[in-house]
């Protein structure tokens, strides 16, 4: 099995959406659950290669995402973004290449189990 196929399988086994966005806010990867969430549930089409701000397109969201990304680059910590109407927490986590350079971030969802 190729490393890429293995990583794709790992990411697709995660039960919630995962989206990778590069330093220029371009969507580069979506796992199966992210594709379902954005394409089937929210009605977007062909987001790979497009700006993250095509689906997060209000000023408040844009500013929150940009501030979170700048904060992550400074302190390296994951950032809580919001709690969805489906009781899922959304986080952003910075991603570095093997040399330690920032290459973007992932947006990931998880079920909010706190009461």
Annotated model-derived regions:
Residues 1-30:
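Sensory modules in modular signal-transduction proteins
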Residues 29, 33, 37-115:
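Sensory/regulatory domains in signal-transduction proteins
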């Amino acid at each position: 099995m190729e490393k890429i196929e293995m990583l794709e399988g790992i990411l697709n086994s995660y039960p919630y959406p995962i989206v990778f966005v590069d330093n220029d806010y371009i969507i580069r990867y979506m796992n199966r659950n992210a594709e379902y969430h954005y394409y089937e549930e929210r009605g977007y089409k062909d987001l790979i290669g497009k700006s993250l701000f095509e689906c997060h397109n209000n000023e408040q969201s844009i500013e929150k995402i940009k501030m979170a990304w700048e904060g992550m680059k400074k302190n390296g910590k994951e950032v809580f973004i919001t709690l969805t109407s489906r009781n899922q927490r959304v986080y952003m986590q910075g991603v570095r290449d093997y040399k330690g350079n920032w290459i973007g971030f992932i947006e990931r969802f998880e079920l909010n189990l706190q009461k």
